[in-house]
Curated annotation (Swiss-Prot):
Designated name of the protein: Ig heavy chain V region 5A
InterPro entries: Ig-like_dom (IPR007110), Ig-like_dom_sf (IPR036179), Ig-like_fold (IPR013783), Ig_V-set (IPR013106), IgHV (IPR050199)
Lineage of source species: Eukaryota, Metazoa, Chordata, Craniata, Vertebrata
Annotated disulfide bonds: 41-114
Region (Complementarity-determining-1): 50-54
Length: 116
């Protein structure tokens, strides 16, 4: 059984600030259960390493679910459903957030969003 992990992009304008904050996600694909996938989220308008950054997801027909967070100091936390399978990380030189997803399951099918 195959399933689709989608990617989208989010654009937000900070209220009262003459600065565009943009998060552009990529890396979705059609994956077999048990497979791996890495999502990327390239940020502009702010510094990823100076903020806490999260991944959330929305399974088909359901609400948003929190997946993982990385704090400015580097501490990481995960939802129980993905712990041990997913890894959040960032590349400060590229101002990019990542989500490495291993041992994927059918229930991981969702649209994934990065969020500041």
């Amino acid at each position: 059984m195959e399933f689709w992990l989608s990617w989208v992009f989010l654009v937000a304008i900070l209220k009262g600030v003459q600065c565009e904050v943009q998060l552009v996600e990529s890396g979705g694909g059609l994956i077999q259960p048990g497979g791996s996938l890495r999502l990327s989220c390239a940020a502009s308008g702010f510094t990823v390493s100076s903020n806490y950054m999260s991944w959330v997801r929305q399974p088909p027909g359901k609400g948003l679910e929190w997946v993982s967070v990385i704090y400015s100091g580097g501490s990481t936390y995960y939802a129980d459903s993905v712990k041990g399978r997913f890894t959040i990380s960032r590349d400060n030189s590229k101002n990019t957030l990542y989500l490495q997803m291993n041992s994927l399951r059918a229930e991981d099918t969702a649209v994934y969003y990065c969020a500041r």
